[in-house]
Amino acid sequence: LQIAIARDPAFCLLSQENIDSLAQYGQISYFSPLYGSDLPSADLVYLPGGYPELFARQLYRRKRLFNQLRDYIEEGGKLLAECGGMVLLSHSLTVRQGGTAYEMANIFPFDFTMTTRTNAGYRQAEYHGLALRGYESHYTETANPDGNLFTATPVYTMRGNSTSVPLFRYKNVFAGLVRWYWGEMDMLDLWKKVPTETNSPAFPSFWQKNI
């Protein structure tokens, strides 16, 4: 497998154990959304967490990469986006209340706004029998009017309380605000569990290519 991982100051929350887990299955290459890299040819793309809010203006300008991500997704490419990686796939990111809403890749219709309130804690989920464990930590509020169209499975605290943001799926894309731990698991199992009769919606009307 050819595995492409985003890595730069905006997407830097990478677990070495997760990288080692992926390295068992193929060759890893890195690219930088922040510095204008093209999307490498890949069988799997991993967008980890980080601090996109610190570089929102620069990321907003990466229209070429956004279009490459859309083409990759429409062609059935596998992609996992965690926390900051999910923000990159959202409709927009507002760094402060009342500030500029910077358009992101516009894969999902969610609008993120940075706040002073943290959401943090260990999380768990189950996707078609696959048990997931990870950690969530962010300062964002999410407006997702069409979010239910994309829900793959709910996410819970370790005490069993539901969280506000589930794990989302569109085609072969999984996205959420949790940074999952793959050290003792096979990340590729996510796609093995995708039902044959997929109920992923067509790209909704909000989706438009950036010119």
Protein language model regions, located:
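Cysteine-nucleophile active-site neighborhood
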Residues: 52-128
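Active-site proximal loops enriched in glycine and acidic residues that flank catalytic Cys/His/Asp
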Residues: 7, 32-35, 48-50, 83-86, ...
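N-terminal beta1-alpha1 cap of cysteine-dependent amidohydrolase-like domains
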Residues: 1-64, 70-72, 112-115, 144-146, ...
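Short loop/turn hinge sites at secondary-structure boundaries
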Residues: 35-37, 76, 158
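Hydrophobic anchor at the start of a short beta-strand
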Residues: 28, 79, 173
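Amide-donor transfer/coupling interface in amidating biosynthetic enzymes
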Residues: 112-211
